[in-house]
Amino acid sequence: MSPISIELIIQISIGLSASLILLFAFLPQTLLTIKTKNTAALTISMFIICFIARLCFSLSAILTIIVYIHNQNYGLSLYALTLPVLICHGINMLLNLIIAFIKINNVYKAKIHKMNENEYIIFAYAQKLKEKVSIKNK
């Protein structure tokens, strides 16, 4: 079993740092979108493209593991080093899917109500406020 080179450890560390930065960049937007359901200013194409990019990064990491294990026999140590990167990419893909789902749902509901997305979001927010007021008045 060959020892893992310092270059490979540095490469994986940089990849993990980039994954964590992306994770913390998307987390506030995802939490805000879940809380407010407001996706009017967001484009669905951005989240789909980001999802595909992260999927490609994940596949690249998996293929790297397979190649290194096959050719250089690093075994589980390489897998253990790249696992955090794969987990971060998986969480990032999940965050993208959550926002994309809320966006698609808002666009769909807006079309049902024959509104644009901005009008529907205002309408839905007004409905929530009415419900809160009626609950307080009871």
UniProtKB/Swiss-Prot annotation:
Coiled-coil intervals, chain numbering: none
Membrane topology: Multi-pass membrane protein
Domain of life: Bacteria
Keyword Glycoprotein in annotation: no
Transmembrane feature ranges: 8-28, 47-67, 82-102
GO cellular component, one term: plasma membrane
Entry annotated with the keyword Transmembrane: yes
Subcellular location: Cell membrane
Main location: membrane
Keywords: Cell membrane, Membrane, Transmembrane, Transmembrane helix
Family, similarity comment: To U.parvum UU007, UU008 and UU041.
Protein's UniProt name: Uncharacterized protein UU042
Organism for this UniProt entry: Ureaplasma parvum serovar 3 (strain ATCC 700970)
